[in-house]
Amino acid sequence: MTMNFVTFNQDYSYLAVATSKGFRIFTTDPFAKSYETKDGNIAIIEMLFSTSLVALILSPRRLQITNTKRQSTICELTFPTTVLAVKLNRKRLVIVLEDQIYLYDIQTMKLLYTIETSPNPNALCALSPSSENCYLAYPLPQKAAPSSFNPPAHAPPGNTHVSPTSGEVLIFDTLKLEAINVIEAHRSPLACITLNSDGTLIATASDKGTIIRVFSVPDGHKLYQFRRGSIPSRIFSMSFNTTSTLLCVSSSTETIHLFKLSQPSQLQETSSANTSSTGRRRSLSSLSQSPEREATEEDNGSSDLASRKHNGTLMGMLRRTSQNVGGAFAAKVGGYLPKGVSEMWEPARDFAWIKIPKPNQGQGPNANTGPLRSVVAMSSNTPQVMVVTSDGNFYVFSIDLSKGGEGTLTKQYSVLESNDRLGYSVADY
């Protein structure tokens, strides 16, 4: 049996594991198996909070919504190409294909909207767990340049979008069904994005993996900038804790970094200051527009924002909202130094870190010679970090929130063991 996919639910109280022989669901605190089926080769699994509703990808193009309590199928959907990711909250179901995103009303399973995207083979996409701030984030689609070559009439249509060359994030309101902002997060293409539980913060990382940035949502103010390291690394997973005071990041270095975010009161002050400065810039930008241009943009709305050219006035105005730097120190330094120099002062280092235990090389069904992939989350009840690795291990580490430093391994389990005793406490040994 091999592990195909692993994920936490929206509040990290459950862990879902898709395998070549069915799927398993565990509670995380205490760690215990709560449901198991041994049928089917499950490619992807997603839970809806702590409910019995589970979304499964049974074959590359087929989605099944299942009620585990009643052991019944609610509905099945088939898509034109391979399903790469599934996202859920209490309002929306999001299906990510390589060049499309489908939005459904989760109550009625009615298709609400289809988004055309740039090629997205890694299914970069984040859906807020919040029903109020119900935002979707994904890489900004980049239009293909017009071609002088006219294909024959019988030829299939070519790609309208190309792979992104920069790390811009589009914020889409899934309730209003319109794009509302573009955040210029990185110069390099994105590698990982995640939203917090309230839908008010987004963390981003590029394919270089050295700098992690946090922006406010939906306005796109840059609030924090963290340095993971100086050597490029692939970011596998990022997760806020439930109170949005910590950000946890895992990468191919097999070290997990924890970054501290300001307290809510400090965050509010920083956001207010940024909002004031942004308002001034928007007013200046508006003055430079002709009445015809301004009216046209108001009439078009923002639902077609993703398809606009990069040099559009509205797009430029939206982008500028992401350039504000949070923090009094950065604001003062930025006034005296060029942007490229001042940003060298900004990134904060981690306050705590975790080293993932080395697995036994070449052993187990999920053994491989590549980097150990990991998914991270933080417990909502205790200062603990939960880590699931691609070799099927589940670790729990304790963190000293006051002193920081290296986390301590306290528990270790296997999510692939078939017996009832799925693990042990490190304290027992």
Curated annotation (Swiss-Prot):
InterPro entries, per database record: PROPPIN, WD40/YVTN_repeat-like_dom_sf, WD40_repeat_dom_sf, WD40_rpt
Region span, Disordered: 267-309
Subcellular location: Preautophagosomal structure membrane; Vacuole membrane; Endosome membrane
GO BP terms in the entry: autophagy of mitochondrion; glycophagy; nucleophagy; pexophagy; protein localization to phagophore assembly site; protein transport
The WD repeat ranges on this chain: 1-36, 69-114, 139-182, 185-225, 230-269, 309-355, 367-407
GO-annotated cellular components: cytosol; endosome membrane; fungal-type vacuole membrane; phagophore assembly site membrane
Keywords assigned by UniProt, alphabetized: Autophagy, Endosome, Membrane, Protein transport, Repeat, Transport, Vacuole, WD repeat
Membrane topology, record value: Peripheral membrane protein
Keyword S-adenosyl-L-methionine: no
Gene3D superfamilies: YVTN repeat-like/Quinoprotein amine dehydrogenase (2.130.10.10)
Motif residue range(s): L/FRRG motif: 226-230
Pfam families given in the database record: PROPPIN (PF21032)
GO molecular function: phosphatidylinositol-3,5-bisphosphate binding; phosphatidylinositol-3-phosphate binding; protein-macromolecule adaptor activity
UniProt entry tagged with the keyword Repeat: yes
Quaternary structure note: Component of the PI(3,5)P2 regulatory complex.
Described purpose of this protein according to its UniProt entry: The PI(3,5)P2 regulatory complex regulates both the synthesis and turnover of phosphatidylinositol 3,5-bisphosphate (PtdIns(3,5)P2). Necessary for proper vacuole morphology. Plays an important role in osmotically-induced vacuole fragmentation. Required for cytoplasm to vacuole transport (Cvt) vesicle formation, pexophagy and starvation-induced autophagy. Involved in correct ATG9 trafficking to the pre-autophagosomal structure. Might also be involved in premeiotic DNA replication.
Notes on the domains: The N-terminus might form a beta-propeller domain involved in specific binding to phosphatidylinositol 3,5-bisphosphate (PIP2), leading to the association of the protein to the membrane. The L/FRRG motif is essential for the cytoplasm to vacuole transport (Cvt) pathway, for the recruitment of atg8 and atg16 to the PAS in nutrient-rich medium, and for its recruitment to and dissociation from the PAS under starvation conditions.
Family designation: Belongs to the WD repeat PROPPIN family.
Name of this protein: Autophagy-related protein 18
Gene: atg18
